[in-house]
Amino acid sequence: AWLPAQALAAGSLKAANSKARAFIQQAMQEHRIPGLQLAVVQYGKVVLLENCGFANVESRVPVTGKTLFPINSATKSFTGVAMMQLVQDGRVDLDAPLSRYLDDVPATWRGVRIRQLLGHTSGLPEIIDSQGAFGGATEPEAWSAVEARPLEVSPGEQFSYNQTNYGLLSRIIVKLSGQPYERFVTQRQFDVAGMPSTTFGDSYDLVAGAATIYSV
């Protein structure tokens, strides 16, 4: 017997979505995740959209489609896109040294290539430690402290994920665009993509509709 391709596709999608839901429920239980949002996009179309669990466990506030979640280091994706937009604008060369764009960095940092910052192969020391900003509570103090440390390895030698790389990229974006990082990303990405609920802030901000942050 022959079944129309559309019917087969619909059946396969339904089965895949069912497996995705089961996987998410299992992951939430195993990792003690109180709540999350899930979206699956296939060929530019949303094929699964789920709101699971609670935004606030104590008050039993459910996650909805309007619940806001902090995305933390996923923000690096926006920084990477912003840098590539500057490349397309002819403002940035990925193979250029850091010193071409920032003249106030240590001598040992000056030869690091932009693509090495993007790919976490710069060899630069980490500006964030287990207590937060390295060397002090303020950003200038943290930069002063980390700039006094030696390179961990030679640039391009190995991958080492850290915050220093993308902090420097953010400074380049600010310098070349002539506007705050947040405004550049909002205008060039969020506004273009139709993301009005995506914004910037820190962990001390009180944001209406935001999920409570929990740690295990």
Positions of predicted regions on the chain:
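Short, conserved phosphate/pyrophosphate- and ester-handling motifs at nucleotide-, phospho-/glycolipid
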Residues: 76
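Short, conserved catalytic-motif segment at the N-terminal edge
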Residues: 11-71, 93-96, 139, 148
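Short, surface-exposed loop or secondary-structure junction motifs
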Residues: 51-57, 109-216
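Short, glycine/proline-biased beta-turn/loop segments that scaffold the active-site neighborhood
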Residues: 94-108, 192-193
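N-terminal twin-arginine translocation
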Residues: 2-10
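Catalytic tyrosine of NAD(P)H-dependent dehydrogenase/reductases that use a Tyr as the general acid/base
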Residues: 69-72, 159-161
